[in-house]
UniProtKB/Swiss-Prot annotation:
Expression sites by tissue: Expressed by the venom duct.
Other remarks on this protein: Exists in two forms, due to cis-trans isomerization at 23-Asp-Pro-24.
Entry's localization field: Secreted
GO cellular component: extracellular region
Keywords: Disulfide bond, Ion channel impairing toxin, Neurotoxin, Potassium channel impairing toxin, Secreted, Toxin, Voltage-gated potassium channel impairing toxin, Voltage-gated sodium channel impairing toxin
Name of the molecule in the record: Delta/kappa-conotoxin Mo3964
Disulfide bonds: C4-C12, C11-C27, C21-C34
Chain segments annotated as transmembrane: none
Subcellular location, principal: secreted
Organism: Conus monile
Coiled coil regions, renumbered to chain: none
Length: 37
């Protein structure tokens, strides 16, 4: 959606507090950005 979850975008926050990204990216907790796995 161009807002979160894709590469170099912020991690998406779920209602339960988890930070997630779209496949295949992973959330880097130290920067809260989505990067390569």
């Amino acid at each position: 959606d161009g807002e979160c979850g894709d590469k170099d975008e912020p991690c998406c926050g779920r209602p339960d507090g988890a930070k997630v990204c779209n496949d295949p990216w992973v959330c880097i907790l130290t920067s809260s950005r989505c990067e390569n796995p």
